[in-house]
Amino acid sequence: IANLTYDDSNKTRDVLLLFNLLTLNNSTSSLMRFPFDNYKKEQWDLEHVHATAGGPPTDKEVNRNDSQAISPSASREMFFKGVLGLLTNATEDNRNENRLDSSEIRAVEDFLNRGNFDEQTCQKFWEQYQTSIENKLGDQDSIDNLALLPSKLNRGYGNVSFIEKRRWIINADRDTTFIPPCTKNVFLKYYTDNPIDFTLWSHEDREAYLSGPYGIITTLKSYLCDEKDE
């Protein structure tokens, strides 16, 4: 399961569908049943939870996100700290063939140390380093960065920041658009213990979504073991 990617679209979609079904089935407090009729009528896409192409959140994005109780500058600082964490983990991951030298890490560290996170400064830095950072990160297409969304909703997103995509998901759910429960959980960071950063889908968030106590592997493994016992 951990090796599934966007390119394995049918298998990955099936695994995420089963994950949603089992999550609902395992929830003793949930009165919701999975709407198979709606699922069959819709076309479904694999949505990247977070594509770093969205860049640091803008003032407007932060201010209209009612879940954020911090300033736009603080949100952008958290974004770059998250990027630094992703870069650091990429250098330590022996599975990543595209190993990083220290230049991108050093650039982000220096930027963080300067402490200026106004919108224009952050956008200028991101425009300068975005391509090299994204080329070195890799693994944007792995299952721990994917979720199910209706095609008509997904294709309206484009490259937006995580905080903006999160706002759209919440609003779509409020407007009674069916959003799979695990997709909602992802953008609410339900799988992450004590989440404080809603600007970026971090390495820790991905690990919790994939392998945490309520994550994909744990949920499916429990189901498959029960099936085997029967």
Task: Please give the residue ranges for each predicted region.
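Long, cytosolic, alpha-helical-rich C-terminal regions that act as interaction/scaffolding modules
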Residues: L86-E230
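Intrinsically disordered, low-complexity N-proximal targeting/linker segments that flank membranes
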Residues: I1-K124, G138
